[in-house]
């Protein structure tokens, strides 16, 4: 199985915000997050939790460029915010 | 389009109106940029006959809530409606009205001095902008710096210029935050508010504020806006189109830019609909403001056939006919002479049932228990609204 491009902690946090994703279903990088229960308020909460987890603050310009539509987009956002590579704090 | 009379019809006060209803009718009569001799005579007659029994507390309260206290104050004083020909007081506490108008004029001068600096700074930074609402309306509709309370400076901008705007405003002492409890500091918005506004309310940015150190101005507020349309409306409009059409105008004594007349009309219609139906505004009692209907009516009165034709075209381009229909329908209820039938007929209300709905922009549709004219002057109209806005942060522009 292809290794996820993100650390387990990221996936755990993301899954906690996807109430419509089965626990044993893979978190596909292209999974539509809105379709699996991530609404606008939850997105904000998720970003706050990810900032705290990874010890980063997402710059405004990156926020505006991101669609948050799938896990890969969210991970790439956090990775960009962290610079060389995001890692749990 | 038929030429509309410059002068609205004389208000018809009902002989059997309750003291509360009389206050409402008086407010409608006096909240006008210009009063004709006929209107003045009618008001003086009504006040002479029924003034003692009128609910003046309600009148002042409603005038304040609807943003028209300086205007009605000016009209009462300027046309000497607060006293009879014999000098008998017809309206108690005449000084409330004169203070409201004169104080507002001084306040607006303070805002003008500050916002002129902002316009210079934005211009010096080479940032393309157009002023929305506010002072351009004061100049166009009233021609009187004291008649209309101004709050913030609304700037329509390209989103990719926001960082430069932030730099220019920071240099002038502005910050994105809220006033502290003691009023002496600006505290940054919490992270949740910042993230919500930056990811969900992409048509605006969090306001930039600066302490004024004046009793009559809480804060100087700059409201950046990057689209006239709510994200949830689904309307996709290139702000560059609006900026390309902007016109030069001297505002606050500074060579500046405002939206062209047609775009001002669109903005007024869309904003009226948004405010009337969005939980954010309903919660703070700013959903129905007579001032906004009055100003749309005045913009319509000033629109010639060319503007009307271009207005129809652009509404079609931006697919905002629903908001326009709502705004024209309700403005016509208050100012029937201001909304030409030819224009209104071009924007029929698709479903009359939607006229009393709210919450659509919030993704949760509800229905008012009472109709528009009942709600307009009911300060407690939101008491039965249980739905809540999920927008955190300042209760300013959305």
Where would I find each of the regions flagged by the language model?
Chain B
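Conserved NTP-donor binding/palm subdomain of two-metal-ion nucleotidyltransferases/polymerases, i.e.
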Residues: 2-151, 157-398
């Amino acid at each position: 199985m292809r290794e996820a491009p993100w650390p387990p902690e990221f996936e755990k946090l993301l899954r906690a915000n996807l109430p419509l994703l089965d626990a044993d279903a893979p978190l596909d990088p292209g999974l539509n997050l809105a379709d699996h229960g991530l609404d606008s308020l939850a997105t904000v909460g998720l970003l706050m939790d990810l900032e705290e987890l990874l010890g980063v603050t997402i710059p405004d310009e990156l926020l505006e460029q991101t669609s948050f539509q799938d896990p890969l987009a969210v991970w790439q956002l956090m990775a960009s915010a962290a610079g060389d590579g995001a890692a749990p704090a | 389009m038929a030429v509309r009379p410059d002068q609205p019809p004389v208000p018809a006060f009902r002989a059997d109106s309750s003291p509360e209803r009389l206050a409402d009718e008086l407010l409608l009569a006096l909240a006008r940029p210009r009063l004709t001799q006929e209107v003045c005579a009618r008001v003086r007659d009504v006040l002479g006959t029924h003034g003692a029994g009128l609910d003046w507390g309600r009148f002042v309260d409603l005038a304040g809530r609807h943003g028209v206290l300086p205007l009605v104050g000016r009209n009462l004083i300027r046309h000497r409606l607060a006293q009879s020909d014999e000098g008998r007081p017809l309206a108690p506490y005449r000084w409330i009205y004169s203070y409201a108008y004169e104080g507002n004029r001084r306040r607006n001068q303070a805002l003008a001095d500050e916002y002129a600096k902002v316009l210079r700074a934005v211009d010096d930074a080479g940032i393309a902008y157009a002023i929305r609402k506010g002072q351009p309306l004061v100049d166009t509709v009233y021609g009187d710096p004291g008649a209309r309370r101004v709050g913030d400076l609304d700037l329509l901008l390209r989103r990719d210029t926001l960082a430069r705007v932030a730099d220019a405003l920071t240099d002038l002492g502005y910050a994105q935050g809220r006033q502290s409890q003691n009023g002496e500091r600006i505290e940054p918005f919490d992270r949740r508010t910042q993230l919500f506004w930056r990811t969900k309310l992409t048509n605006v940015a969090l306001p930039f504020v600066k302490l004024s150190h004046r009793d009559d101005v809480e804060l100087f507020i700059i409201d950046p806006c990057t689209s006239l349309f709510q994200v949830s409306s689904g309307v996709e409009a290139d702000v560059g189109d609006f900026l390309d059409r902007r016109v030069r105008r001297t505002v606050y004594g500074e060579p500046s830019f405002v939206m062209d007349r047609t775009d001002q009309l669109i903005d007024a219609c869309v904003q009226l609909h948004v405010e009337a139906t969005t939980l954010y505004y309903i919660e703070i009692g700013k959903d129905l403001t007579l001032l906004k209907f009055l100003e749309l009516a005045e913009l319509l009165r000033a629109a010639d056939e060319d503007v009307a034709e271009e207005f129809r075209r652009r509404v079609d381009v931006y697919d905002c006919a629903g908001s326009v229909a709502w705004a024209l329908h309700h403005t016509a209820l208050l100012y029937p002479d201001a909304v030409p039938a030819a224009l209104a007929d071009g924007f029929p209300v698709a479903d009359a049932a939607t006229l009393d709905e709210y919450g659509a922009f919030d993704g949760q549709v509800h229905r008012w228990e009472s109709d528009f004219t009942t709600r307009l002057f009911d300060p407690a109209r939101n008491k039965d609204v249980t739905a809540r806005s999920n927008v955190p942060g300042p209760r300013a522009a959305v």
